[in-house]
């Protein structure tokens, strides 16, 4: 997706506003844990925070121990990352003896993947920071389409002066009522490089126009927790990975790291959920582990209306993502 100089200027304006809503201020030291290649998140957030008057630390993706050392060496105040990578940084930092509470870090700007409330709360508690989400997609600009303010953290303000939004039924394409769930459709109003009209994002959300407690009058969208094309159909039942994530983040014995496998057994769909135990939750007793497994399976079945097989994985047994986390492995016969 191409950008001209005008597009880059508009993009950085949108990011600067988003960052300011999240509590970033001129003079902040912003450490970038996104890559700077063809991924739009890195450059967009870099230029936007720079326009706000921040000092940028272009650390890039990977090398987690170096990231943690740089927070201490440079006095980083803002971290830009995916939430799954921020959680991985928590774990590595604690293993190294890094004191998050004593660090200069105070704000997390997260994007690239959904951040459920349970995961956000865990990162905030372990890093001693305030975490906010932002939303965007490469096809219409990149990050900066909408962002979370500190007054009402369950929604994100849409940059309505740059994007015309619609919410439609994903099956029929017909508009849905205000506050009703549907597929977000966006038309960039200022994009010149590659303009698009009524771009169907496949992201499921609802939009609300009532005023926000922060005083901004921009419409707010619910945080995107699923996509119409992420949906798994298991034995005729619609299952979203976000539903599984919501259940697992509410169970204190397991970490937010998980892996979903779908395969065919005897001509039927089988759903397998691998979830990682916290070290303090591990028990030598087979009966205790089996009881925990059964409890998780029952909670998932109550939400999904499909009975999954639950596998408990040892601490650290699920691979950590540096960029966007890939949670689903669909092995079904095509």
What does each model-found stretch correspond to?
Residues 297-334:
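Conserved C-terminal "lid"/linker of ANL adenylate-forming enzymes
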Residues 59, 134, 168, 263, ...:
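Conserved beta-strand termini and adjacent loop/short-helix elements that scaffold enzyme active sites
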Residues 79, 185, 189-306, 322-323:
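AMP-binding/adenylate-forming catalytic core of the ANL superfamily
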Residues 3-6, 10, 84, 114, ...:
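Conserved active-site and cofactor/substrate-binding residues in soluble primary-metabolism enzymes
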Residues 106, 115-211:
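Conserved AMP-binding/adenylate-forming
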Residues 112, 136, 236:
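Active-site glycine-centered loops adjacent to acidic/histidine catalytic or metal-binding residues
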Residues 97, 172-173, 305, 323:
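Detector for glycine-centered tight turns/loop "hinges" at secondary-structure junctions
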Residues 1-132, 140, 145-150, 154-155, ...:
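Active-site phosphate/ATP/adenylate-binding loop shared across adenylate-forming ligases
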